[in-house]
Swiss-Prot record:
This is Proline--tRNA ligase. Consists of three domains: the N-terminal catalytic domain, the editing domain and the C-terminal anticodon-binding domain. The keyword Transcription regulation does not apply. It catalyses: tRNA(Pro) + L-proline + ATP = L-prolyl-tRNA(Pro) + AMP + diphosphate. GO terms for molecular function: aminoacyl-tRNA deacylase activity; ATP binding; proline-tRNA ligase activity. GO terms for biological process: prolyl-tRNA aminoacylation. It comes from Campylobacter jejuni subsp. jejuni serotype O:2 (strain ATCC 700819 / NCTC 11168). The gene is proS. InterPro entries: aa-tRNA-synt_IIb, aa-tRNA-synth_II, aa-tRNA-synth_II/BPL/LPL, Anticodon-bd, Anticodon-bd_dom_sf, Pro-tRNA-ligase_IIa, Pro-tRNA-synth_IIa_bac-type, Pro-tRNA-Synthase_IIa_type1. Keywords: Aminoacyl-tRNA synthetase, ATP-binding, Cytoplasm, Ligase, Nucleotide-binding, Protein biosynthesis.
Amino acid sequence: MMRFTKFYAPSLKEAPKDASLPSHIFLTRAGFVEQIGSGLYNFLPLGKRVLDKIKNIVKEEMDKAGAQEVNLSFITPASLWQESGRYNVFGKELLRFKDRKENEFVLGPTHEEAMLSLVKNKITSYKQLPLHLYQIGLKFRDEARPRFGLLRCREFLMKDGYSFHANEEDLGREFELMYKTYSQILQRMGLDFRAVEADSGAIGGSGSKEFMVLAKNGEDDILICENCDYAANVEAAKRAKKTCQDERPEANYASKFHTPNIKTIDSLAQFFKINAFYTIKAVVKKAIYENESKLVVFFIRGSDDLQEVKAQNTCSALELVDASEEELKKAGLVAGFIGFVGLKDIDFYIDFELENEKQMIMGANEKDYHLIGIDVVNLNKDRFKDLIEVKEGDCCVKCGAKLKQSKGIEVGHIFKLGQKYSKAMNANFLDENGKSQPFYMGCYGIGVSRLLAVAIEANHDEKGCIWNKTLAPFVLEIIVSNLKDEKALEFANKLYRDLTNLGLEVLLDDRNERFGVKMNDFELMGFPYALVIGKGLENNEIELIQREGLVKELIKTDELMEILKKKVL
């Protein structure tokens, strides 16, 4: 029998000092988790029960999709990461260490290399493909500033899966299957989510979708079409080409115009009495690479902003930082007057919406001068890239309707890795013609421990957690208001046995505490329902409380089981 007096759930009156998000505050106060170090958490019985439910849902859906579960070592030899080329690229988040024999290892934040090593030289023929292996295990990422509880910690539980294919078409089929599988996982958990276009980040690859649970405290900005199913992370969002109804500036030919001290887009637009849409803005960044750094110039409309992740991917840099005035001078660039005409010895890219635009105004690479009447034509096609940040109110690239901005928390990510890792690690198979080919790979991750926190970020109130029936550690709590009332206690014990025999997860609060304390804990822990057995039992009445909205209802004892079967079971 699951009695509160025997159940370990130490609740706290005060939240941790560094806790700012509801999930961090309530999960710690309610005794679901306990922080033992920076970004490190223990899961107590309540938290472990929820964690197991999440794991079971993930496992059931992955198995249903034909994936096979394995369990890889938490520690990976550094040689595998060196072979793939990620050892130095990944940065300080990758925890590197040596054993007593000076052998180098890493704590795996992801397991592409380890999983590829598992199948390399064992899957040798197209006849053995496709293959999808997954695991649910610990990961470690040495975050510089762990925060937000389970949402950004250093050690976390994750489901990561990897698929191997003979061709790109079959990889595409598996990608779509995982899209449906992840959608089903999150639907079963009762979460409001969107699958969004995304940047592949350090993992790499081409096709990429993130699964975002909508929450007002979300750390990611996402854009959602008001009409169709298009949704994208702001780092990867696209839009229908923007137009402007304002009059375009006219010049009979391209010419240089004196613009004294006109260094900003706003002052340039005012000077020529035009919309900034018809100007070209230069954004100069210093691109950091493994062994060097250099300046790169990105040209976009004056009315747009540079999307830095897009820009970083465009020039394949490890990082982009602002260029200093000294660096601009050294490169011969005049701040406020930079243009691509005549620009030499510096890499530059132009936003693809500017291609074939005419009668534009931009810097002349000379102090106090701009070029007018510029046509963006006859340039190398490779210079045109998607560089701008899409914003709320822009039009959907799929249907043309307006985009709205929302907040989301990433809980899953699926990638088409292609042949990036298999080529780097020389992992091949023989195709139908007997020719050696690198595997096509897919990668599919979902944050299991993160989902526990996300469920509360999406569903809580000022009093505490609000669990749905699928994820709740207990679906129903039976609260005896007065333990000295033997009749009430006897009724509660019998009710507990009857409900558990029906398969319901029930917690009996038999603590010798004030009724107010018990109710506060119920509201904090957030089980979907509570039954209060008190003085009303004399009139054959019991109070049923629904945690969401704290809706209360008096029920006759002879109708209780029937109502519980309808509402709770």
